[in-house]
Amino acid sequence: MALPRSGNTLFASLINQNPNFACTANSITMEIMKDLFLLKQTDVFKNFPDHKSLDNIMDSVYDLYYKDWSQQYIIDRSPVMTPGNLAVMQRHFKQPIKCIIIWRDLMDVLASYIKWFENEPTAFPNKYGKNTIEEKLMMLMNKDGAVAKELVAIQNALQPQYKHMSHIIKYEELVTQPKKILQSVYEFLGIEYYPHYFHNLNQFKINGLNYDDTVVGNNMHTIKTEMRLEDNPYKKLIPQSIINKYGHIKL
């Protein structure tokens, strides 16, 4: 669980070196659970409220979705810790919930977005009639967008009653101390450490599939083959209005 452009794809590329692990792309499983749950609000269901039968399906979503995946451990990438999502999962996911949170400062996330959409014409923020950087960033921060959902999920995960479910890693440490960070993840999961490599990294791929970034914009999920922490000059382009509105958001 992490904000977009916070090292999700890098983390997945690293952890998936272990053949027993599958860290997924952006997952649709939580959307499946939500849509099934919302069926209970429909007139058809209310007319014949067979909760048990629908609950049977919801109890089985994850087992069915990952039925043909060969890996022993699956890290499903979704905003599981929003209050609504967590309530559904606590009822229907029949295993302990463990959540890995990657945190990157929000202003660095937005600077990464700026660098991407200012240099990539196909980037989705360029497709909605938004002309200025401020307009594009405000669109990204929409309350129904991925950034907002992940922020809500992370905020909820940090509540005292849920902290035991979560393990927080910082983007900067993932890049500069990857072995130490991955060791902490294995310890959190209670799994024996696997020797990873940290140079000449592969692009994300799982079960023969990779992202089709023609949907959201080229290079949205492209990672560098070598890890290094760099200053992003595009951070200077973040409008003051955005800083005033969101700059206070910290871990």
Regions found by a protein language model. Give the residues of each.
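PAPS-dependent sulfotransferase catalytic core
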Residues: M1-V61, D68, F204-D212
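Broad structural signal for hydrophobic residues in well-ordered alpha-helices, predominantly aliphatic
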Residues: I15, Y65, M89-Q90, L158, ...
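A short, structured active-site edge motif that brings together acidic residues
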Residues: N26-M30, I102-M107, F198-N202
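C-terminal/domain-terminus segments
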Residues: M30-D35, L174, G247-L251
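PAPS-dependent sulfotransferase catalytic domain
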Residues: D76-H196, G208-N219
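Short helix/strand-capping connector loops at secondary-structure junctions
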Residues: V215-E230
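C-terminal accessory extensions appended to soluble enzyme cores
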Residues: E226-L251
